[in-house]
From Swiss-Prot:
One Gene Ontology molecular-function label: histone chaperone activity
Localization: Cytoplasm; Nucleus; Cytoplasm, Perinuclear region
One Gene Ontology cellular component: perinuclear region of cytoplasm
Region feature Disordered, mapped onto this chain: 1-52, 123-254, 418-492
Species annotation: Drosophila melanogaster (Fruit fly)
The name this protein goes by in its record: Nuclear autoantigenic sperm protein homolog
Acidic residues bias locations: 124-145, 244-253
An individual GO BP term: CENP-A containing chromatin assembly
Listed Polar residues bias regions: 226-238
Superkingdom field: Eukaryota
UniProt KW keywords: Coiled coil, Cytoplasm, Nucleus, Phosphoprotein, Repeat, TPR repeat
Modified residues (Phosphothreonine): T32, T33, T185
Coiled-coil annotated spans: 377-400
Keyword Coiled coil: yes
Amino acid sequence: MSAEAEAIVTTATADVSSPSKTVAVEPVAADTTPDNAPAVSTEGSGKAEQERAEKILKGKELFSQGSRNFLVKSYDEAADELSQVCQLYEEVYGELADELGQPLLLYAKALIAMALDENKVIDVPDEAADDDDEDVDDDEEESAEDGAAKKEEKKDTKEAANGASSSNGKELDTIKEGSDEADSTGEAEQAQSDEKPSKKVPTGVDEVSSSNGGGGAAVNDDERPSTSNGEVTASCSNGAAPAVEEEPEEEEGVSGSLQLAWEILEAAAQIFSRQGLSGLPYLAEVQTELANIEFENGILEAAREDYEKALKIHGELPTRNRRALAELHYKIGLTYLMQQLNKEGATALRQSSVLIEEEIAEIKGKDEPSERDRNNMLDLEETKQEILAKIQEIEEMQAQTIAEVRAALDSYIKPMSSGDAAAASSSSSSSANGAASSSSSSSKGAAAASSSTISSSSAKPTDITHLIKRKKPEDPSSEAEALCSPAKRAAV
């Protein structure tokens, strides 16, 4: 054995046999119990920190995915991912923490966009149903025409068969009866076989007419009810009825999404208002989204007030975002126009166009504008032209309204003025006639008075000679007769 090995063995035996070493080992064994307890607590805290870090990392990944889906307008997926982000951040940071501000804002915007898309898509199934109805009607007309043609062919064949039977006798009659029975049984079997696929496919008119042949088509045309009460119409109505029944559910979903977005925005507003100057841009965006919800619900005055609040918040920012300001003025103008306040709406739209012109001038003033700046400038130019066209339309509408009002007033005032003139002329003529009549009457009265005075002054007797009966003059013959006759003589 070598010297080194002997030294190792001797030192090992010395360590085992040494009492001081055993005494030194005893306190170490006694100290292991308290040393193990903090080791367990550190392991638990390490796991908690690890879980917390994993949640934060997962939340960041989900937030980036949700932001990307929001930008590409996949609002359903964005809303799902951002809701998970909000849940994870609330577990990690607590309720209404500063880290929850931006996820809540983007989540609310995704809900609003999703509700708007659902609201736009509501009428599409009805249009599709109308198209289906038109297609089914066309198919039914075609199948009816085919059936009529096939019926005529069948009648021709039957007439030919009848002529042959009359010429050939009873044998052909029996053959024809057998063929008719075979046709009837075949048609019944085909009708039964056609009822099964017609139940499965409600609108398969072309398939039924093409698979059955001549006789089957004729049977289907006879057995199938008309369009007003038939299976095809029933299937279309059954297909359209769920769409009509689903409309209230879709409207409830839209209102529920907007209500949830409203509550989320209120929570985000509390977070950003607590952050001070750094949270003002997000607070202005929150106020704008609240106004958008009110605008979509038709609460125009409240929406306009919230838009004006957003304008006020933008005024407190150190940098001026002209595009956001132009959009706010445009929305305010729309609220005015929807309330038939054309003058105020045109004023707001002009302010929006002025801000857009300033933004375009700033982009043009750059020495080397980027591709993004050039694209933005083109978009702004297009938006400006649309706003100016809207303003021109409003002005033309106002001018037309004013012209119509003036024409109506003129048409109303002219008859009145002509009536007044006629009344005035009639009154003047009547007054003139009255004056003339009064003058004539007065002249007549004066003449009568003068004649009365003249008659009274002259005192001429009235001529009543025509009333006096005069005696006939006595003839001399009568006087001689009277003298001759003793009877007529006067007594002396």
